[in-house]
């Protein structure tokens, strides 16, 4: 029992353990809390399956700034074909470019020369002939040589024309074209009897034909060159006769006057002056930040600071207010919807239909395409007329900046509330300073006469009257703003009618 600690030692050990526990708890409590991770913005990935009229539903990286527009609203407008999709812009374009060169520019490859265009139109028969010629079917040996003891090995040579990895028209099955060899003609066995036409010492011909030198290839007399499968023949025919779909879409493009990139000729058109603008540039436009009115006589006053406005976006070409665009969808090759309609578009393409959009007034998506065509015709007439007219903002086919950024009203309301709180704080500080200054003056002038106290009371009454006038003028200003907004609303309704 000598090893058992005494009672005093047990109490001391318990105290040390409790002190260590409390000390450790304090240390743990004093540890700074880990900083909260900032809320990351959701990343937008390009999905090649989501396409409309040959363009994507997400930006293509023309602008590297923050994409603070409503991406869901933009996708909805593009899917309903009221806004042009995000096309991939071309840095340059030449009318003399061939389909091969244009396809290389679309895919971002170096532009090849017209003379160095790869032989994509080579006939299948030529390749088959070259493949059959390169295969040693039989070797005739002289009479003084013994027949080979081992079966000859088949030498498969690649095709004469190989396509580079940067070729935009590259066939995914091109690397297998040299494997079209009839294995029955090239498979030999030592146990199998030697055909009569391969026997070197016993020729079948009675007239004594000359022996063929060794190393010269011969094909069986009763064999024919293998034919390519029908799918390969069909692919070659389509490649030779018809250019790819993207080449048709990007042929004769137009240049965006803002980003100076070339896009397909079915871009957005401004409602006021019928000028083209791509969707990349359109979604970057926004209203100005809330600011006081510029036409106020004294914008630095309290009333001027409270009256904040956010003016609508003006047209970058003609400076007309309420900037909006109109999109005329493509009719013909490449016209297809995205999302749920991708399967229908693929089925239409498999059936050989060049257009997935009905030319009649009623489309599969419930969109009035006839109305869109009328708007497009009106825009074309506007561009050629001497006196240009504009399409109304209330037109259902016009997409304004406010539709792409619907949170502008919340931003304006927050700015006005912030300015009102700032003004209220300033008024409270001024009133407190005035009251404290008056009390000090009364306490310091205890020996003054009754006349001084009357002056102080008059100043207080004047200050109260001034505050009352400020509140009255603020109420009048708010009522005038409400009446002005009501008049503008009535005028817009009359214009729309």
From Swiss-Prot:
Chief localisation class: cytoplasm
Keyword Cytoplasm attributed: yes
Location relative to the cell: Cytoplasm
Keywords tagged on the record: Cytoplasm
Composition-biased stretches (Polar residues): 136-146, 185-194
Entry keyword Cytoplasm: yes
Composition skew (Low complexity), residue ranges: 112-135
Start and end residues of each stretch annotated as Disordered: 1-52, 112-172, 185-240, 348-371, 438-497
UniProt xrefs under InterPro entries: Sip5/DA2
One annotated Gene Ontology cellular component of this protein: cytoplasm
Biased composition (Basic and acidic residues): 17-27, 34-44, 486-497
Role description: May negatively regulate the SNF1 kinase.
Family assignment from sequence similarity: Belongs to the SIP5 family.
Protein's name in the database: Protein SIP5
Organism: Yarrowia lipolytica (strain CLIB 122 / E 150) (Yeast)
